[in-house]
Amino acid sequence: MSILISPDNNTGWGLCSAGMYGGAKRRSSQHPVRVRGHYRAPWGAYTRGVISRRTTVDDVIDSVVADAQRYTRPVATSTVDSVIDSVVANARRYAQRKRRLQRRRRRPTAAMTAARAVLRRAQRIGRRAMRRAAASASAGRARRQAARQAAAAIASMAQPRRGNIYWVRDASGVRVPVRSRPPRS
């Protein structure tokens, strides 16, 4: 008598009693059940010339599809909460930017204001000289003359002037520096 053992793919193979008990008719302590008498390849190892139609790309596609099927949308957040959060974040960012700007800005020293005034005056004189020269002479000579006059103005401004500086209140009551001595009243 032989027994049909059917694995999950139902190919099956027959075992007679001689194969089952090592040649004995019944099982005994001398003839225990024989589990495996030789190497057995795993199921699906020998396909008898049938070539697998699947590739590694198919596996990747299957995994992507499985991930997409398992995907659940995140719980919708309250729009009021999100608006409040964004307003708070923007306010913090604005405060940080303002703090950074305040740290960077320094009050100009007297030397800086004087240098700025010298530069402004030299530019004004240079522009005036350029206009004057352009009206009367050729452009090349005018440019050279204007440059010469501007250089002279800068040099004269750079030299320290003699004389005292007096602080006088103007019409609005603000104290301003003046070189000429105010009249005694």
Swiss-Prot record:
Record's GO cellular component terms: host cell; host cell nucleolus; viral capsid
Induction section of the entry: Expressed in the late phase of the viral replicative cycle.
N-acetylserine: modified positions: 2
Keywords: Acetylation, DNA-binding, Host nucleus, Host-virus interaction, Late protein, Phosphoprotein, Viral penetration into host nucleus, Virion, Virus entry into host cell
GO biological process: symbiont entry into host cell; viral penetration into host nucleus
Residues modified as Phosphoserine: 172
Modified residues (Phosphothreonine): 55
Propeptide: 2-23
Pfam families the UniProt entry points to: Adeno_VII
Sites marked Cleavage: 23-24
Short motif (Nuclear localization signal): ranges: 175-185
Highest taxon of source: Viruses
GO molecular function, one term: DNA binding
Post-translational modification: Cleaved near the N-terminus by the viral protease during virion maturation to form the mature protein.
InterPro entries attached to this UniProt entry: Adeno_VII
Annotated signal sequence range: none
Misc: All late proteins expressed from the major late promoter are produced by alternative splicing and alternative polyadenylation of the same gene giving rise to non-overlapping ORFs. A leader sequence is present in the N-terminus of all these mRNAs and is recognized by the viral shutoff protein to provide expression although conventional translation via ribosome scanning from the cap has been shut off in the host cell.
Family the entry assigns: Belongs to the adenoviridae histone-like nucleoprotein family.
Assembly information from the UniProt record: Interacts with the core-capsid bridging protein; this interaction bridges the virus core to the capsid. Interacts with host NPM1; this interaction might play a role in placing the pre-histone-like nucleoprotein on the viral DNA or regulating viral gene expression. Interacts with host HMGB1; this interaction inhibits host immune response.
Function text: Plays a role in the inhibition of host immune response within the nucleus. Interacts with cellular nucleosomes and immobilizes the host immune danger signal HMGB1 on chromatin. In turn, prevents HMGB1 release out of the cell and thus decreases inflammation. Also plays a role in the wrapping and condensation of the viral DNA. May also promote viral genome import into the nucleus.
Protein name stated in the entry: Pre-histone-like nucleoprotein
Gene name of the record: L2
